[in-house]
């Protein structure tokens, strides 16, 4: 019998050594495994595991009232029965006193690649049976795009990602890939729902081997794989829209755009062209104008225009570009530029959003209709855009704009979180910490003593993926994996299913929640339902017993390579887009009707609220990139992430010119700061990043010293601003951040405490 565990970053074999210790090994069928995942085995047994239920001392003394001490208080160990009793009392009290809309059930994160133990599914099922909850919509990864794309191409974000032109198709006919934001391979190591085999690097290499040229437009050279030998165009962060507008200007001025495609497949071009030519505000979007904004030489802009005019071109937009001030604009403008080139719907090019952002985008696999745990229906209609949680806690009842709607923030009295770490992914963490004190009660299911656990009132210790059985069924991955339990539950921890079952029993709906099914019953249920559903694809799965014995099953790869919007290209009348016009909307009357000042009827240059073109107090632009040695904040306690630290802090990439001007050397502990906070990090001097830009990867566990107001470990979200991309999308804007940096003095340097368990500090 083969033993595997599949995670969001890859699939591994597990075994026991002579001392009964779990060891992980790379799966031999994966040509590009993720190194940091091997550290899961050690992390599953480390000193930061939560050993039993805990309650915060101050909350217990004030029973059901916030005392403002979350994140600063001691914890008291309690029994499971006591923990279930306390939590169920608070849930009932909140429901009966304020209604279910006063409960915010959060599960944002990548807690499990398994379909059954998927934390959000468990949370939704439990709270829907309890009467509902206020929820969040969108993803921090691509919130602006989720709102924008239906208006522009008539497809939701997930359908768009699944429809991407495959690497194989591009390798056959494309000649140039213009990478706005690059294609960093480290990002492609992960995929929501799990990874069988890593394929992105193989796809990019095939394009390169077939002669496709790549241009990396980014402040970071490493945003492009080394083997591509890509042309490097360093650009000021947040100015990609201006560059694209200037390329459109050249195409229009030279009469080099594809008029037939614009006429037959788009609407609203004339209004957009008038803006580009300066007929609306007397400002031409010329190369000279764009150069002053982007810092790219005028000559280089003309050279880029010549490339895209003469070559079959793919316009690739990274997810990171829309996590910035007015983040809707670079994506909208990228689609518009691709439309002007006229190769949308062909293997020659078009546009892409998120190539190399995750493993599955661009692979040669069709989406599978896999089934999951039934979740029921949420009777509460209140929701927030996912990145507006601090606003919600600060301003209950306040009206806000979202996608043309006027909505109000719910008044939250209780937060229940399982699967995720808002003290990683949210912006302006000092502001979040204050807002986090407002609810009466905060309950979490958590594996380790991370910042999320330390800012809670009631803590249920949860299992890792190694401590449970599950099924990796990713709709966008051809490999299905039997996730087998590798070790017994650590100490007194439980699965999320067991935790919610215990609460459901206290609250009187255990039978409805479990349907009298065990863990393995549910796993087989999901397999059986998926086996039925896949018949629509003319495919057959083996029996569950055969699959479980072998440990994995691989589905066939389709013979026809997908090309995005190919049906629309072949016959726009027969296969219209789901936009009001049935076409690509370069100008949108729907968005125009919203009358928003920060998102107009067509792509537009908006000056960011912080950027290198308007320096006042802070002279460096901070990029908080995805980390190489962990997934977001997951496994920051793992060996690979720990070994990447500099003097125990997260490394910050600094250009040699900026370091020299500040008398900083490699390995120094430095202080990054702005009006929102202060962060310690370890200096890594490199000309891989352009002058004026520093890079501090996201995901270092938040480790604040509340007395000195300094974050000790290197979490960039202490410095980022918490404001929406626009009134349309309300996405996060973490990449619009100016900071200053200096060598830290002795009084500012403190030991990192986040990896010391509260259980061992007594």
Task: Place the predicted regions along the sequence by residue.
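Short beta-alpha connecting loops at secondary-structure transitions
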Residues: 228-234, 466, 478-490, 639
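Active-site phosphate/pyrophosphate-binding segments
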Residues: 138, 247, 267-394
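N-terminal export/assembly segments and adjacent metallocofactor-ligating motifs
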Residues: 1-256, 297, 505, 704-762
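Phosphate/diphosphate-binding loops
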Residues: 1-8, 440-441, 447-448, 482-508, ...
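Long, contiguous, secondary-structure-rich segments that constitute the structural scaffold
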Residues: 496-550, 633, 638-653, 657-762
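Flexible glycine/proline-rich, aromatic-decorated loop/lid segments
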Residues: 223, 450-483
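Extended redox/cofactor-interaction regions of prokaryotic respiratory oxidoreductases
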Residues: 119-206, 210-217, 242-245, 339-454, ...
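N-terminal leader/propeptide and maturation segments of large enzyme subunits in energy/redox metabolism
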Residues: 59-82, 249, 254-298, 302, ...
